[in-house]
């Protein structure tokens, strides 16, 4: 079973913020396929569905961002999900807005949600989709910037990014070839 995790903070006030872009991709995929997060366990909201003939678990941690591993690790253990079947979607300040980067593995890169998952799983050897949100250009504090809602103009770009990220996940589920999907989907979304 594949496990797709979107990172974000719970609560209405965090919707459509830079830090919640992982949730936005999961929500988009759920809506497109008429699925819903109908289960809760181990601090995570989740569902298990069939997509492209594969069993897939979608997870949104119900913790704050920096405790995301407390939801992901126990759910993966409970359902006996292999680390190679995990993909985590999250915001990345080091990528320009409108760009995604798929990676087979890597460090947390300063992202506290990823730090928590890596710590709880005991490895950084899992797939991820980094979604560019850019860095603040006006000297704004990082914490304020990532918790700020996207402007309407930014949201137009991010809606394309959300859809592109969802297509990348679907392409991986269909092909089971992450290397090919990386080659096709990495980069700027036009």
Curated annotation (Swiss-Prot):
List the Gene3D superfamilies. Peptidyl-tRNA hydrolase
Looking up NCBIfam families in the UniProt record yields:
pth
Asked whether the keyword RNA-binding is assigned, the reply is: yes
Q: Which CDD domains match?
A: PTH
> What protein name does the entry list?
Peptidyl-tRNA hydrolase
The processes (GO biological process) annotated in the record are: protein quality control for misfolded or incompletely synthesized proteins; rescue of stalled ribosome
Q: What is known about its subunit structure?
A: Monomer.
Sorted keywords for this record are:
Cytoplasm, Hydrolase, RNA-binding, tRNA-binding
**Pfam families given for it?**
Pept_tRNA_hydro
Which residues take part in binding tRNA?
Answer: 14, 64, 66, 112
Give this protein's Gene Ontology molecular function annotations.
peptidyl-tRNA hydrolase activity; tRNA binding
Q: Where is the signal peptide?
A: none
Q: What is its EC number?
A: 3.1.1.29
Q: Which family does it belong to?
A: Belongs to the PTH family.
Recorded catalytic reaction(s): these are: an N-acyl-L-alpha-aminoacyl-tRNA + H2O = an N-acyl-L-amino acid + a tRNA + H(+)
As for subcellular location, the record says: Cytoplasm
Q: Site positions for Discriminates between blocked and unblocked aminoacyl-tRNA, renumbered to this chain?
A: 9
Keyword Flavoprotein, does the record have it?
Answer: no
Record site feature (Stabilizes the basic form of H active site to accept a proton), residues = 91
Gene Ontology annotations for the cellular component aspect, listed alphabetically: cytoplasm
Functional description taken from the UniProt entry: Hydrolyzes ribosome-free peptidyl-tRNAs (with 1 or more amino acids incorporated), which drop off the ribosome during protein synthesis, or as a result of ribosome stalling. Catalyzes the release of premature peptidyl moieties from peptidyl-tRNA molecules trapped in stalled 50S ribosomal subunits, and thus maintains levels of free tRNAs and 50S ribosomes.
Q: What is its main location?
A: cytoplasm
Instruction: Give the positions the UniProt entry annotates as the active site.
Output: 19 (proton acceptor)
